[in-house]
Amino acid sequence: MKKLPLTDSAWLTMESDTTPMHVGSLQLFELPNNAPDDYLQQLMQRWLTFDEPQPPFNQKLVYPLKGLKQPHWDTDTEFDIGYHVRHSALPRPGRVRELLVLVSRLHGSLLDRSRPMWELHLIEGLEGKRFAIYTKMHHSVVDGMAGMRLLQSSLSERADQLDQPPPWAMQRAPKKPSKRSPAEAGEEAAATALPKQMLGNLAGNAGSIPALISGGRKSLGADRKIKAVAPYQAPKSLINQRVSKARRFVAESYSLERIKAIGKQHGATVNDIVMAMCAGALRRYLSEHDALPDKPLIGDAPVSIRPADQAEAGGNAISIILMDLATNEADPLKRLARIRESMQAGKDKLGAMSRKQILNYTTLVMLPFTIGQLIGTAGRVRPMFNLVISNVPGPKKSLYLNGARMQGMYPVSLLFNGQALNVTVTSYVDSLDFGVIACRRSLPQVQRLLDHLEASLAELEARN
């Protein structure tokens, strides 16, 4: 058995019927030119023969019978491959619209905690001789970046490779010995122990709260001159409502070369342009609904602090940067300048900290957010930030599944109470793939955000 870290188990604690805590991915593939009519049936039949999955795909939760101890991961000895791997077909005409409706529905349902917490859906019937794969895994198992790496591991850069195992059957390379010194390892262990105390039993360990606050203050002490956005400066907005079960997922791809050119034109990075696109789109969307706050929206940009040699490791290794989205600024160039300045300040803040300090800081900042989810105040009080906007680097070369080229890879993230919208972006070869997930009830016509993203990009493109 493997003990579930308390920082990971927080995702289980925050989960409810209306806030599933899983992350997903939608991958689009084009059928090979010589694919037989039963190509997908053959693929599915082959996959079902891989019924002895590797970790973390064979791990399920086991709860101790006595006390309030944390659950453990243990191998599922009754693993049912037919439950986890499913075959679906779209109704005609099989447009992307029908695909997104299906993904929206699938993403709104909870994963079964009595089984390993993941599902993969092979979806046929997509127009243009294409098919799709939708996968979801619980956030207590992987964070978004690790999940993406796990899925990529089963794809090949060779179109002629037809024997690649599916992701759940891939043999993982053994972990490399840590290159950190004993002092560094001890520092990380001490840092990790503190959030575990806090998330494990807050009431029973109240004495640890001053220690956490002290650690967080020390983490911030070295960079007080850095003008980064502070938590809980975000205005209440249409986005920050309590959420229902129903989800609406929309997706779009944008040329990476185009975005790079616009960034070069304005002395900005690709990430700066992505954030400016989102800010401009949000300004337009909220203005359409007569709901644009006077104060700027604040975005949360998660950043990975996972060591490079642990790219496919399970669990979570993330911190956050809070940024001014400048949605109260009408001029797109001034808006971009504010976003760049805010992002740089956030990076400087984290850059001035050790890994221990980053973990202390992240726990201190996120603890009230987590408590708000648990006690029901989220969505009813001023938000810590308005929405999460993630930008995750992806593959730089085309990838293939059994000869089928992957056309796009769209992240499908999660929502919280008080956070009815999430935008996650990943790069793939020469494109940036945007995945937008929203509460269907709280945010009407969320597909309009795609039009506004393009309008915001064109607006920056037109300015010299």
Could you say what each language-model-derived stretch is?
Residues 1-22:
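Generic start-of-chain signal for non-secretory N-termini
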Residues 1-7, 26-38, 44-419, 423-454, ...:
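Soluble acyl-CoA-dependent acyltransferase catalytic core bearing the H(X)4D motif
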